[in-house]
């Protein structure tokens, strides 16, 4: 089985694309049990049995050679489970920060089916701490949440159900459809595609180019992560104000950061696009953005209400909410690769440099990007085990600067701020 990579193309050559989640499991665990649970969970998702194929003409696919007609919802058994490719769990005594700082610089071998790694870095009689690292082509933030749920179910002895890939299609991209869906901006991909195909003669890239990009970028950069555990009483206070002001928690947090930033900012938001509420592993997210400067002549409440209005306007407009999907898919796939390589510093061309500048892949990136997973729709307890800590660290994608991740599991609300700095 093959699935064309369309709306996820910008993740392919991005050099900072690892989604991280760290958890603490309360309960008597052992290495063999954790290994077995991880292997069972990887068998439950079709995408984790795939590899990414790059053709010479620049097209890219998820390819599952082990697909034997498994159906959504069927129990995962030894007779119908796919082979676990290169998704592994490791055990070491280290800090999670050291692990993440080391691993985000190492390219996932997606051509060999490596999408997911887990590192158990603490273990004692009371439980263990694990950090899960996933390439964004393995799925979005919710995908990793659902994988962790499956991992915990398997750890407690529960049988898992098989989950197929569900990708967001780019939809029709002919000239008329682009004009209808993109409006006046339809000329942008059309113009740049023409320049790219003329100047670069349909140049395409391969995994060697990807290796060079990682080496070039990470020898001059490193990430910093700030993690804030928000006490339940503080969360309740903020939620009370949100209810009183008729705003969301995301708008409240955004306003707080805008007050700190002190200037007009371009803020991006990841938006869940799972219309049917499925729990598959795949990229099923879109995005919106707003621009706003905190007005110090007005109260925090007034600023927060304005931020919420700007967000709501975009979220209630289906065309605005979906815009980024057909827009990015309208560019030549190899040109999308090229702007990521421009960002990494390993490739230069007049066309890709110009487009990278316009789209914020160079110096003028988004000031802030927020992903709020809200209250996670997974249990805390799994038999004798309990997830009593959960933290979500989104990647600093090529067009981002200050990346904020928010998650709540039970009484545990954690906010992270992920940034990249030059060294």
Where are these regions (language model features)?
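Hydrophobic, well-ordered secondary-structure segments
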Residues: 90-123, 133, 160-177
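Hydrophobic/aromatic-lined pockets within catalytic cores
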Residues: 139, 152-159, 243, 257-262, ...
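Acyl-thioester-dependent acyl-group transfer interface
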Residues: 1-61, 67-70, 83-116, 262-423
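Structural preference for long, well-ordered alpha-helical segments in enzyme cores
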Residues: 30-44, 130, 144-154, 238, ...
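Non-catalytic, low-complexity flexible loops and terminal extensions
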Residues: 1-9, 85-87, 94, 138, ...
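Histidine-centered divalent metal-coordination motifs
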Residues: 45, 135-136
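Gly/Ser/Thr-rich phosphate-binding loops and adjoining beta-strand/alpha-helix segments
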Residues: 14-33, 110-131, 212-276, 411-414
């Amino acid at each position: 089985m093959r699935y064309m990579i369309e709306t996820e193309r910008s993740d392919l050559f991005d050099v900072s694309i690892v989604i991280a989640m760290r958890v603490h499991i309360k309960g008597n665990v052992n290495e063999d049990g954790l290994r077995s649970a991880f292997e069972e969970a990887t068998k439950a998702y079709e995408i984790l049995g795939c590899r990414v194929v790059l053709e010479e003409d620049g097209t890219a696919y998820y390819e599952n050679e082990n697909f034997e007609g498994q159906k959504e919802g069927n129990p995962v058994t030894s007779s119908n489970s796919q082979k676990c490719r290169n998704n592994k769990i490791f055990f070491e005594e280290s800090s999670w920060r050291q692990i993440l700082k080391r691993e985000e610089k190492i390219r996932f071998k997606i051509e060999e089916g490596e999408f997911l790694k887990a590192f158990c870095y603490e273990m004692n009689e009371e439980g263990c701490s694990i950090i899960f690292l996933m390439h964004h082509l393995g799925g979005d933030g919710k995908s990793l949440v659902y994988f962790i749920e499956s991992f915990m179910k398997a750890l407690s002895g529960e049988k898992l159900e098989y989950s197929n890939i569900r990708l967001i299609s780019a939809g029709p991209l002919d000239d008329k459809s682009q004009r209808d869906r993109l409006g006046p901006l339809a000329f942008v991909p059309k113009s740049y595609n023409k320049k790219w195909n003329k100047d670069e003669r349909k140049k395409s890239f391969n995994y060697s180019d990807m290796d060079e990009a990682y080496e070039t970028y990470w020898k001059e950069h490193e990430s910093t992560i700030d993690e804030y555990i928000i006490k339940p009483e503080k969360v309740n206070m903020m939620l009370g104000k949100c209810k009183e002001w008729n705003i969301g928690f995301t708008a409240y947090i955004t306003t707080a950061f805008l007050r700190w930033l002190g200037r007009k900012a371009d803020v991006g938001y990841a938006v869940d696009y799972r219309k049917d509420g499925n729990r598959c592993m795949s990229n099923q997210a879109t995005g919106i953005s707003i621009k706003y400067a905190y007005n110090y002549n007005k109260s925090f409440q007034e600023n927060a209400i304005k931020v919420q209005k700007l967000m709501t306007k975009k979220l209630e407009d289906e065309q605005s909410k979906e815009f980024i999907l057909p827009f990015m898919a309208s560019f030549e796939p190899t040109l999308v690769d090229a702007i990521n390589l421009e960002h990494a510093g390993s490739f230069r061309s007049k066309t890709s440099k110009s487009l990278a500048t316009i789209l914020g892949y160079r110096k003028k990136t988004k000031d802030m990007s927020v992903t709020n997973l809200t209250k996670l729709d997974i249990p805390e307890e799994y038999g004798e085990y309990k997830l009593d800590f959960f933290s979500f660290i989104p990647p600093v994608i090529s067009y981002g600067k200050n990346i904020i991740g928010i998650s709540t599991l039970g009484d545990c609300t954690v906010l992270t701020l992920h940034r990249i700095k030059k060294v």
